[in-house]
Amino acid sequence: MKNMILILLGLLVPLVWISPCPAHPHVFVEPELEIELGEDGVKGLWHHWTFDEYFSAWIIEEFDQNKDGLISTQEAEKLYNEAFKNLEKFGFWTRVLKGDENIPVTRLEEFSVEIKDNLATYSFFLPLDIPVTPENKDILILAYDEDYYCQIFFPPGDVGFRGDTSKWDVEYSTQKVPDLTYYFGFITPVAVRISLNPS
């Protein structure tokens, strides 16, 4: 039965990407964001995505194989390979802009899944290694599904920082990005904007 469900999902996902019909969200995500700083700028992003109760129930049913209420490292690896790795083609629903430059999001590290109060949270790191200079110090970070199958309530209410935080004075705010409007022009994504200056 499980294999049949995964096969059906595999058949349906391409239709979601190419269908011209108006979509509406089927999955909802409450995000948290941490920005890891390095000696030269931004090393990468830590996403923590908590899914709605219905999608969480599916994750638990399908991937908590020993029914202990946890997603082990082995179970998380299986989940990633079968139900998340395909988002690599879409930058893991993450856009990063530095001035006019679109920073490619191509790799994911340290994927894990936590179950708490019957809700599943994906945590993962996106390595970026973005150097910052006084002339080019502003970075925009967005997370959204352009096809609107999944609604990510981004930006989060707060942003965390880790890594070489003592080396930088950080300012952050939010801003709409009209150039990235999607869903037939109805939705304008909101970015987290950070500005880094050596402390």
Give, region by region, the residue ranges found by the protein language model.
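N-terminal signal peptide c-region/cleavage motif recognized by signal peptidases
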Residues: 18-20
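Short, hydrophobic/aromatic beta-strand segments
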Residues: 44, 57-61, 134-140
